[in-house]
């Protein structure tokens, strides 16, 4: 029997949002298409004429039996295909808003394609039409609000038994949840980077697909002759949640550490969080391996104990790290801010650069997750790549201090006998690793802090402060034994603001826990129930950190951050911090970045990073005067940055306390640049940093002392210096001043601040600092 039909079809375009390009594959940009309305066979001939160049696809449930053809504008073409198939016309991405018109003749088709459109088609009538078809040609098409499903014959019975309204709701809630998590809105918005578009996800079967299922440019598919998993509207349907989540893998996801197969799972996990009860989540959530939360936690605890880099963890272990952050009050908003800022950068920056995700996360979040992420063996780059590939400091640790963030930490790490299952503290938690801020659990701790300092007079009589966010929790001075006794505060992690010396400068840090031991930029006080004794170390500083150590930065594919090389001339050590296993996949197993150190013509260190499958972690080697460091980077003219100089090759001759290379900045130039960075950051955050002693003031003072014209800079930057070195400052342990003198000093400082800002930012003695404006902390949108 010969069936022939001729019809005209208007195909409207897919809107191209400003934050995507036509070549992108995200958000199902190329998934939207229109069926021609018939099931066809090898005997079918399709003749098409279109007002625009279009793609026709002849689809079924096997990629090896499908075909894609192009129809040129205003020309007539005829096609056949030697399989059973359903023809579709792609919507043009970013095409004319009026769409294009297709004149089509289908000769000798098998049957009319049963087509269900939500809100328009009667479900019973649709199913009757499908039921009447022969099983071997019973393809069906579902046009839902956010999904298009080409259902193959093997799923006929399941489709007939399915509530299509429930299926539509399933896909709608998935897309709405994921869109909300990344900050896309469906209402009119003045910000084009937040506006949604008419996207739909095309779902099908593909018996020759990859893995169990996949997401790609043109559709998402189950690797089977059946697509039954895509027809099961339930919160435990991880396959569908996971694959649609891949639509939200934007360019920054592959930054260090690579979060491919993780970022999409974070979205999928939030769907389960929203649509499961507490008991269901304990039993069925994928993040807890379907009822094995204890095992998940034990395995992660083992990773922590072994100090295994986060990059080496399994996909689901990596996801769990995000799960516990997302469970907090500020988790979702942080994810939305990252995605909004990504879209703004991609939209308005002609040479976009994206931060490593965890650096981005802690800078944009309203909560402080630094101690938690350090516990989870995450290493921060603490720097930002600019559009010209110069690299600047983000002051990552200081950012949390500036913004007075509350600190979140796993409850089990604070309260040793806490058990989420028995709820023994009356605090409902999804996991023993659920994150809490101080006071959220009714458990208290008392601490004795021993201050280990070479000269107790440097801190005697001065106040130590402990904060929970902006709230002052405790304050006191050291006793005669150089101790601080903190009684009965809530278990949690706090910020301590400590005196840092009078005429001496110190690195100040706690020696525990190991994950943050030695952190000088932000003092985290751990009030836990099992370790009542703490040790606060005062390590004497007599030189500027900027003059003691310098860093080089290794970028890889798409200018993503890959490694940092640190030369510590004071400690006589070079360390290489590798943040990602894949540097540039285009180079595969060929050499990409090489660095070595020679002493007396013999290698003391020699390592080659290839394009892929590299070591992740830290490698170190001792260096000594007379050593030579050499490096090679395949793309080093833009992607190996040493003090913002770029080259394929660098050679450094190590001297007693610096290096010899006339193509690189001198030590004084490095110190002056760092001085400008410190002043710019202190100025931008004066209200929070000026009133308190902090590491940045110390660094500024020590940097100035290392410069030949230090007296000038001591006067110029006096308001930003540690208290002991400010003009006419009064040390209460040495005598008393009159009220009049105090008022005079206060007025002088105010006037000095105004004068300094004029001098620094208008003149700066003729020196330029093109990066200063970009070194203030990132602000959330």
Model-derived regions: residue spans:
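Beta/coil-rich, acidic/histidine-enriched accessory regions frequently appended to metallopeptidases
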Residues: 1-4, 352-566, 573-577, 657-658, ...
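Zn2+-dependent metallopeptidase catalytic core
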Residues: 33-41, 51-203
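Extended low-complexity, serine/threonine- and proline-enriched intrinsically disordered segments
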Residues: 52-64, 340, 457-472, 578-606
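Short, surface-exposed beta-strand/beta-hairpin micro-motifs centered on an aromatic residue
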Residues: 77-79, 481-488, 614-620
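Catalytic cores of extracellular degradative/oxidative enzymes
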Residues: 128-327, 335-349, 357
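Extracellular juxtamembrane-to-transmembrane boundary of type I single-pass membrane glycoproteins
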Residues: 729-747
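Single-pass type I membrane-protein transmembrane alpha-helix
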Residues: 749-765
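Intrinsically disordered cytoplasmic terminal tails of membrane proteins
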Residues: 765-781
């Amino acid at each position: 029997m010969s069936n022939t039909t001729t019809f005209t079809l208007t195909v409207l375009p897919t809107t191209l949002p400003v934050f995507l390009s036509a070549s992108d594959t995200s958000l199902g940009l190329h998934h939207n298409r229109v069926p021609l309305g018939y099931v066809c066979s090898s005997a079918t001939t399709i003749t098409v004429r279109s007002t625009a160049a279009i793609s026709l696809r002849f689809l079924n449930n096997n990629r090896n039996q499908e075909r894609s053809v192009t129809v040129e504008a205003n020309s007539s073409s005829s096609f056949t295909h030697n399989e059973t198939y359903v023809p579709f016309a792609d919507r043009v991405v970013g095409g004319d808003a009026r769409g294009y018109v297709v004149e089509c003749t289908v000769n000798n088709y098998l049957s009319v394609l049963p087509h269900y459109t939500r809100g328009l088609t009667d479900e019973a009538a649709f199913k009757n039409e499908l039921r009447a078809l022969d099983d071997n040609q019973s393809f069906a098409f579902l046009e839902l609000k956010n999904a298009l499903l080409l259902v193959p014959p093997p799923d006929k019975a399941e489709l007939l038994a399915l509530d299509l309204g429930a299926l539509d709701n399933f896909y709608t809630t998935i897309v709405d949840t994921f869109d909300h998590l990344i900050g896309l809105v469906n209402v009119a918005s003045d910000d084009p980077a937040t506006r949604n578009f008419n996207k739909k996800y095309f779902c099908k079967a593909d018996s020759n697909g990859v893995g169990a299922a996949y997401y790609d440019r043109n559709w998402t598919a189950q690797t089977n002759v059946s697509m039954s998993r895509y027809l099961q509207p339930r919160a435990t349907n991880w396959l569908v949640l996971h694959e649609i989540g891949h639509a939200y893998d934007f360019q920054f996801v592959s930054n260090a550490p690579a979060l491919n197969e993780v970022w999409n799972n974070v979205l999928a996990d939030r769907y389960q969080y929203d649509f499961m009860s507490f008991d269901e989540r304990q039993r069925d959530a994928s993040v807890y391996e379907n009822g094995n939360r204890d095992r998940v936690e034990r395995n992660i605890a083992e990773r922590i104990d072994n100090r295994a880099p986060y990059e080496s963890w399994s996909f689901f272990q990596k996801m769990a790290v995000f799960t516990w952050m997302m469970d907090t009050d500020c988790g979702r908003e942080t994810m939305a801010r990252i995605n909004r800022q990504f879209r703004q950068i991609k939209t308005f920056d002609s040479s976009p650069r994206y931060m490593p995700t965890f650096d981005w996360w802690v800078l944009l979040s309203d909560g402080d997750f630094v101690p938690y992420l350090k516990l989870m063996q995450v290493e921060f780059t603490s720097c930002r790549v600019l559009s010209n590939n110069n690299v600047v400091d983000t002051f990552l640790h200081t950012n949390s201090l500036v913004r007075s963030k509350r600190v979140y930490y796993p409850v089990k790490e604070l309260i040793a006998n806490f058990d989420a299952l028995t709820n023994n503290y009356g605090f409902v938690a999804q996991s023993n690793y659920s994150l809490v801020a101080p006071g959220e659990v009714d458990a208290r701790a008392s601490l004795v802090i021993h201050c280990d300092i070479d000269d107790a007079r440097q801190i005697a009589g001065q106040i130590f402060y402990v904060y929970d966010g902006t709230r002052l929790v405790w304050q006191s001075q050291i006793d005669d034994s150089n101790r601080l006794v903190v009684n009965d505060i809530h278990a949690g992690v706090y910020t301590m603001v400590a005196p840092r010396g009078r005429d001496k400068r110190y690195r100040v840090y706690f020696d525990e826990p190991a994950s943050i031991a030695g952190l000088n930029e932000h003092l985290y006080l751990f009030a836990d129930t099992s370790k009542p004794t703490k040790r606060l170390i005062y390590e004497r500083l007599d030189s500027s950190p900027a003059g003691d150590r310098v860093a080089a930065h290794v970028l890889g594919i798409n200018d993503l951050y890959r490694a940092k090389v640190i030369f510590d001339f004071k400690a006589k050590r070079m360390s290489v911090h590798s943040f990602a296993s894949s540097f540039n996949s285009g180079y595969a197993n060929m050499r990409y970045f090489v660095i070595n150190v020679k002493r007396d013509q013999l290698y003391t260190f020699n390592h080659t990073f290839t394009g892929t499958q590299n070591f992740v972690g830290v490698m170190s080697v001792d260096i000594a005067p007379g050593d030579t460091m050499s490096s090679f980077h395949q793309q080093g003219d833009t992607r190996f940055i040493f003090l913002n100089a770029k080259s394929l090759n660098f050679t450094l001759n190590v001297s007693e306390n610096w290096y010899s290379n006339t193509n690189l900045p001198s030590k004084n130039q490095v110190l002056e640049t760092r001085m400008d960075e410190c002043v710019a950051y202190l100025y931008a955050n004066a209200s929070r940093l000026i009133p308190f002693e902090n590491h940045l003031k110390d660094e500024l003072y020590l940097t100035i002392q290392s410069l030949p014209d230090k007296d000038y800079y001591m006067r110029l930057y006096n308001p930003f210096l540690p208290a002991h070195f400010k003009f006419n400052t009064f040390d209460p342990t040495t005598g008393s001043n009159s009220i009049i003198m105090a008022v005079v000093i206060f007025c002088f400082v105010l006037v000095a601040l105004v004068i300094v800002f004029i001098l620094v930012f208008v003149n700066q003695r003729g020196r330029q600092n093109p990066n200063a404006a970009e070194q203030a902390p990132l602000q959330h949108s």
